[in-house]
């Protein structure tokens, strides 16, 4: 598979800064293999929401198997009153998993987050609630004049029209790189309009509207074959080029440098 098969996880690396991760899907295990084993991992994660494909990698993140390692997780506050810690910990414990989060040698700290701006080291982070199923955040990260927005799961209007909430637009406006949900084609969306995602066409439209420099199509449908993605990407590239947006498809191990 050229595009890969793990679920959502992106790493942001900047000189002099601790690692900043976006989501903790099964790709987190893959990322863990890249971490220098001679150094204790100390980093942070911006968690969009609590669906399994965004948290499954946490108990398999090998760097947390060392005492002294740490991961600060910033994710959406829940509407039922439970904390982020309570919800994640309820899924990673016996009998669902051999050990609990508290039993990991490393330290995992959870921070309930809503519509807010904050800093992690020199990273300036903007979090905004965006449409999806359940409390979901999108993020904008700025560092040294560079900017990235991450909207991994983003519900397009269910009637198939193109519009965007003020919070979501606030995240993507003028960014250097937009990593955006691009799960469906229009015929697929017509059948799954309430499933919390959007079309590739919508992602390209939003990038054009927000004057984004580069769009990375993300959260590919799991049934998609490599050749299918190639064809869909080709159409998106052509559409983006008409409005000055460079369109790429996210793939496992892809590195994008922001100048």
What feature does the model see in each segment?
Residues 148-155, 189:
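Short, basic, glycine/proline-bearing loop/turn elements
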Residues 130-131, 142-144, 153-155, 182-184, ...:
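Histidine- and/or cysteine-centered catalytic micro-motif in compact active-site loops
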Residues 1-149, 159, 169, 229-259:
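Binuclear metal-dependent hydrolase catalytic cores
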